[in-house]
Amino acid sequence: FMEDVYALTKQLDPTRPVSSASGGVLVRTDIWTGHGYEQNPEKFRKIVWNDGKLFTYRSRYYESTGGLYTKNYGFNREAIAGTYDYPEYDGKMPYVFDEYGGIKWTNEEDMKAAANNQGVSWGYGNSPRSLEEFYTRLEGLTDVLLSLSDYICGYCYTQLTDVEQEQNGLYYYDRSEKFDMERIHAVFSKVPENYK
């Protein structure tokens, strides 16, 4: 199905790049994408850049396969990917990290109401305990991707606004500001070292 959608889209407009899926399990694409929501910047870097390869990890069948790594499925796992022989990223097309972050932050009242109830409010990992911890985590995760700018040509923080129970936006559901937007702007305006 995805190969047909890709081909049809290219027939309609061959000048535009086509991404057949966001974040992994790519069948045919012009832009390779990955998702990652690890909240610890050091662990995030190891996930994104594992043994000199973008977003590969040991197969859960690592031992029985003689030490094979999975193909670049992004955040999707083998159980989701099934048995289809998906292509592996070869470094020849743009790699965009199109979802990362997802840091939960909400007002104190909502935080208390949502304790241990993801149906009310959730984000990825543990919520920061302070605004300063939020800024530090956001900058650390973003710096990981910027440090790999020789390999990753773009990134997208998830997400811009809270959506229903997802409390991981940079703005509240009503689009009011959660944070000091000058600090947020400073993080997202950083230029990779090798671009200076």
Task: Explain the meaning of each model-derived region.
Residues 1-32, 92:
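Active-site neighborhood of glycoside hydrolase catalytic domains
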Residues 16, 25, 38-39, 162, ...:
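Residue-level detector of flexible, active-site-proximal loop/helix-junction positions
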Residues 21-58, 93-103:
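Aromatic- and acid-rich polysaccharide-binding/catalytic face
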Residues 52-196:
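Substrate-binding clefts and catalytic carboxylate motifs of secreted carbohydrate-active enzymes
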